[in-house]
């Protein structure tokens, strides 16, 4: 009696499953990396929006700081910006700052990524990314 040899051996199936697992792992790493880049781009755009709003506020008022605008949440109400992770808005207080306005601290809920704008630089996690003209002076 002859048996036909149709199908795959167990070793062949295990090799295929291992290859699929490796490809899935690589795809997942690339996907999460792209997600983080997109979130960072949103936060940078939000920081630019805040810069524009604060400069407009300083041009419209006689105040040299924007404490009220930042502290009471009206800045975020005016801009409609949000943190891509859905976390709370966090802002630095500008009390006591003369001349240069130190404005934005945006933090993700996990607390691992943050972007800061001050009068001299735009930074991510404390490292300079590029300089910006947020030195809105009265």
Question: Where are the language model's segments positioned?
Answer:
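Short intrinsically disordered, low-complexity coil segments enriched in acidic
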Residues: 1-2, 135
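Glycine-centered flexibility motif
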Residues: 15, 33, 82-86
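Generic low-polarity alpha-helical segments
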Residues: 1, 43, 116-119
